[in-house]
Amino acid sequence: MKKRRTIIVCICILAAAAFTLALALPKKSYAAIGRNARKHYAEYETRHSDPQDEPAKDEDDDSSEFWFPVPEGYLNKKTDEKKYVSSINPDDTPEQWDALEDAVQMREVSQIPADILETVSTDELVLYCMNYNLFIDFMLFNTMQDGMENVRSDYNGIRELMTRPDAAESLIRLYKLYDLDEQKARDSVGCIRLCYLEAMLCMPEILNSLTAKQANELAAACAQKISKIVNDENSPYSVSTTMYLAAVSQYAASEEFAEIVNASSGAKRYIEEGILVPDEISDDTLGRIVSYFQEL
């Protein structure tokens, strides 16, 4: 009995010593965390910017589509995915599309009919928006915000979506279900379409309606996608809009994160303009941002 008590006392002493040592060891500074994050991001950027040979495409075995493939579980019913595509489009009706005189006519035939717009559910309205013929136009501007404002002015689907009180809920659910590999295999423009979905989530009406829970769900979904992209050397996806979505959603919903960002002119510029200049953000600020997301 005395021997057992002695062993227990020794274990307690060792545990106390280990705990004291852990407290005495210097914690990794925010600046060190920031430097490490900057290093990894630079390595990713270098790898991502290097031109890589595209795998040869077998035209006889191309299963990808021009419309948006609906992820399983998004709708609670089976549906014809092509019902959300405009009747006149560059893939199904190329002759009619090519006969259109200018961009004005292209936009006109790409609108959602009024009777559908007034009655369609928000979940399905999102799918109409994902299939907008000219959605890629959002990439033709200096900033993503300017691009999406242009799409808003040109397309009644986005304008209607931004009035729906449950738009954020529908968009977040779709984003969480967006499997990178599956969508890339099924969608001929899957990588660009993901950026478009992320750009919709970054619109002011969506960000301003987010609850803290929704913002955290978005951050978790973004982190999952970023991890998959950066760890796959051959990934065709970019993390740019994904990183931005994670940042602006937290900035809108978290006072703590907003305080970190507002203390850095470079970080604030990134949030407000979508322009990332790494040298404008200090290692300390970057470390605080990384630590914030790690603790979510």
Where is each model-derived feature located?
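N-terminal Sec-pathway targeting helices
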Residues: 1-13
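Ser/Thr/Gly/Pro-rich low-complexity, disordered linker/stalk segments of secreted
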Residues: 47-59
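Non-catalytic all-alpha helical scaffold/repeat segments
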Residues: 38-40, 66, 70-296
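Short extracytoplasmic/periplasmic juxtamembrane "stem" segments immediately C-terminal to an N-terminal membrane anchor
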Residues: 40-46
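Sec-dependent signal peptide cleavage junction
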Residues: 21-37
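Low-complexity intrinsically disordered segments
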Residues: 3-5, 17, 43
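Bacterial N-terminal signal peptides
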Residues: 12-20
